[in-house]
Amino acid sequence: MVPEVRVLSSLLGLALLWFPLDSHARARPDMFCLFHGKRYSPGESWHPYLEPQGLMYCLRCTCSEGAHVSCYRLHCPPVHCPQPVTEPQQCCPKCVEPHTPSGLRAPPKSCQHNGTMYQHGEIFSAHELFPSRLPNQCVLCSCTEGQIYCGLTTCPEPGCPAPLPLPDSCCQACKDEASEQSDEEDSVQSLHGVRHPQDPCSSDAGRKRGPGTPAPTGLSAPLSFIPRHFRPKGAGSTTVKIVLKEKHKKACVHGGKTYSHGEVWHPAFRAFGPLPCILCTCEDGRQDCQRVTCPTEYPCRHPEKVAGKCCKICPEDKADPGHSEISSTRCPKAPGRVLVHTSVSPSPDNLRRFALEHEASDLVEIYLWKLVKGIFHLTQIKKVRKQDFQKEAQHFRLLAGPHEGHWNVFLAQTLELKVTASPDKVTKT
């Protein structure tokens, strides 16, 4: 299969060379990418269609901010089963759950955004959702069970004049870093699959992994262990929202900035600066500002007060700003696999519950999301013992058993999650 993919990648490269003028934008302000006669907006991505093969599901093209088309081959996570299967319109093979009778489980729902279909678990960019983002911010979205979750991410400075896009990311990196995307399963992976051979937290330097050992990844590592070049900067406020299927809504203007419908921000005044305990929401052109209500319970015993934040945070969620290297004495555990469950018990339409069952842990994390004014907010993270979770397992349905890093792609990049303590108040922790 690998030679076939390389041949298809070569065909795509020839196609891009054959249509060099199609890959560049015309003149501002109407900037777009033209690929095989179809227009794409900056930030939009798609599977290319090449004759005679048709849609290339293992290849993805992206229209950059400079309106240049770049295409790359999708990297599939390792599978740990003797007979993985590849379903139609999917690139990566997956394991078939042996305990589920055939035909009883519906296939994961796909997502559609701006005329492009995305498969369950696929990651893409959608910059138009946050028109007021900073130059070093980008929007990363993920398709999960037919719903699109998007996050505003603050990218590190690449430090070179011509950075390249990273697969499974909306950020860019220098050529040396981006070209180090490894095709070998034995490579040491870190955030977004970029290799860092000097990572002291890699699994037993120099030793080969066994056939059943998961590939190491830094996606689910605590923020303080993320390599300096890829650690999100705290200057940018990060929001996590779900894009609902609704008609276009009016934007809001506050302090000279434009905010799209559903976007939230902390207002700022010259005499006081940003107000972390006040949160404003754009609702179809109208600004609604509320005072933050902090959670009464935290997932740790001793939450701490941090300057610049309204509510206390757990110590393990803090990033050391002076920590420029990966710790050589404290290394995160290998994430392994994680089973993702969704609640099937009757519940209001404005609630979503997910349960994450880690292989290497005796605890199960239950995430509760609540729909508040058109946006799903993370309201609670509760940890229960596996034996206690098994007692209510009949109320959950297994979605998939992906590598933990895939599920945590947003958590690894997100410095702040919106947490609600009441249906009408929103809190940033």
Swiss-Prot record:
Annotated GO CC locations: cytoplasm; extracellular space
Induction text: Up-regulated in breast tumors but also in lung and colon tumors.
Keyword Secreted carried by entry: yes
SMART domains, alphabetized: VWC
Modification sites for Phosphoserine: 182
Keywords: Chondrogenesis, Cytoplasm, Developmental protein, Differentiation, Glycoprotein, Osteogenesis, Phosphoprotein, Repeat, Secreted, Signal
Post-translational modification: Phosphorylated by FAM20C in the extracellular medium.
InterPro entries: CHRDL1/2, CHRDL_1/2_C, VWF_dom
Any single biological process term in GO: negative regulation of BMP signaling pathway
Keyword Nucleotidyltransferase in record: no
Organ and tissue specificity: Highly expressed in uterus. Moderately expressed in heart, liver, prostate, testis and ovary. Weakly expressed in skeletal muscle, kidney, spleen, small intestine and colon. Expressed in the secretory epithelial cells of uterine endometrium, fallopian tubes, endocervical glands, bladder and prostate, as well as the transitional epithelium of the urinary bladder, and in bone osteoblasts (at protein level). In normal cartilage, expression was confined in a few chondrocytes in the superficial zone as well as in the middle zone.
Transmembrane regions listed in the UniProt entry: none
Assembly and oligomerization: Interacts with GDF5. May interact with BMP2, BMP4, BMP5, BMP6, BMP7 and INHBA.
Name of the protein described by the UniProt record: Chordin-like protein 2
Species name: Homo sapiens (Human)
Gene label: CHRDL2
